[in-house]
């Protein structure tokens, strides 16, 4: 789990905060995952909306909390946690409520595998979102803002130079020049295909992605299919995923994401 060290954090005031604080953005798929976990466990938190369209995640203040400039970020009694899947696991370990992470070794291994796949696909999901859903003029970053983003914040996660930030900078600089070109779009679509096939087969034999029942893995992948459906992805060929998705959508706590 990604809990920042004291030396990673430059916005020092959050180290004195008490209670549960969640920095998030309503349209962010990663933020949606964490809000679902809080809702399922009936956990009250203090929300801090970070407007990604207005570049609030690139401010010195926010980069001092999350050196990557991503949402969500959890601050709990002065401890700072980043990365949505890690925050979900932290919630599961730290608070009362339904347990969404497995104890069975085989399920742990499979969950870690498919959670990493989901995380690795995030830039592809972002590319498809920007190609088909979000207007380019809203999401493209000004070069001056990118210059600030590149140097602001500590640049460290867990005391080490953060390589993830350079990946983010590269994505945004290319998009500022080229938008999301057709070849990138095709590559993004193809990147999902083998994993959707795997999940569709698995859901043919199980109601949920893990044999124990509903889990955080279902939340992670439901958010992906939710976004892909908004983008018009043809799920007709994945009937098991379609049925699973509709079952989850009927859960009230998942509808309000």
Which role fits each region the language model picked out?
Residues 1-160:
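GST-like domain detector, emphasizing the conserved glutathione-binding G-site
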Residues 255-257:
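Conserved small/polar residues in nucleotide/adenosyl-binding loops
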